[in-house]
Amino acid sequence: MSDQQQANQQDDQPFFNIQRVYLKDMSLEQPNSPGIFLESEAPSVEVQVNVGASQLQEGIFEVVVTGTVTTKVQDKVAFLVEAHQAGIFDIRNVPVEQLDPLLGIACPTILYPYLRGNIADVITRAGFQAIHLSEINFQALYEQRLQAAMEEAQGQGGDSGIVMPDGSQARH
């Protein structure tokens, strides 16, 4: 096999690389401090996690995992933390049907430990007991979102599907 053939074969191989992981945005609100520190009742905690992806240029994608933690004591907000943990990923030569799961499962799985650490750190630095977010099965979350989108498409009576990053549609 010539060097040129070998180079061409390598150029066609699927490629995945993490270019950068970074904290894109983070906010902390403590609307009822310092009085909330005197409360003795156990707080209630609500956690929301969302995933978004966008193409920055050919083969370069940004994936953002957003985590929001709202803690209340009775009806008073003790604190609200929102963090956007992002990553830039170089993804080439991946079939379009595999790209969406890669962006919706593999990339968030890489980013989530950073998000967990950043949220726990800011909560502790704010003077509260650390809240350690539990692990998330991004495969199951992705499948739930896919199922919900397909049901919504069926409910609209159209044969529309999921719009993939390249603009094509996945149909079931």
UniProtKB/Swiss-Prot annotation:
GO terms for biological process: protein folding; protein tetramerization; protein transport. InterPro entries: SecB (IPR003708), SecB-like_sf (IPR035958). This is Protein-export protein SecB. HAMAP family: SecB (MF_00821). It comes from Cupriavidus metallidurans (strain ATCC 43123 / DSM 2839 / NBRC 102507 / CH34). GO terms for molecular function: unfolded protein binding. It is found in: Cytoplasm. Belongs to the SecB family. Residues 153-172 are annotated as: Disordered. One of its GO terms (cellular component) is cytoplasm. Keywords: Chaperone, Cytoplasm, Protein transport, Translocation, Transport. NCBIfam families: PRK05751.1-5 (NF004394), secB (TIGR00809). Homotetramer, a dimer of dimers. One homotetramer interacts with 1 SecA dimer. The gene is secB. Gene3D superfamilies: SecB-like. One of the proteins required for the normal export of preproteins out of the cell cytoplasm. It is a molecular chaperone that binds to a subset of precursor proteins, maintaining them in a translocation-competent state. It also specifically binds to its receptor SecA.
